[in-house]
Amino acid sequence: MANSSLSNADIKHLKGIGHQLNPVVMIGGQGVTPTVIEEIGRALNDHELIKVKIPAGSKADRDAVANAIAEATDAILVTSIGRMVLLVRHNPEANPKLSNLARFG
């Protein structure tokens, strides 16, 4: 899902929070598997805003992987820089001690 539903101010704010985060999920050689999607979904439920490290490849390949992850997890792709992807999915029932939006926002 593209970041079209976020305003420029929202994107800037989320990038600022995301800058200090470490990747929660790193995708290995097997690529995007159902298990990886499940783990990303779990991380989004807990943290709302996460970084994912994707495999090396061409820019088009990395963009395709980033968009596939966002679509499969119903998340919004905030930004994709190099091998890092920043995703957000709001969870009204998120634990404030785990949510990166509540802790850093």
Positions of the model-derived regions?
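Positively charged, polar, low-complexity stretches
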Residues: 2-105
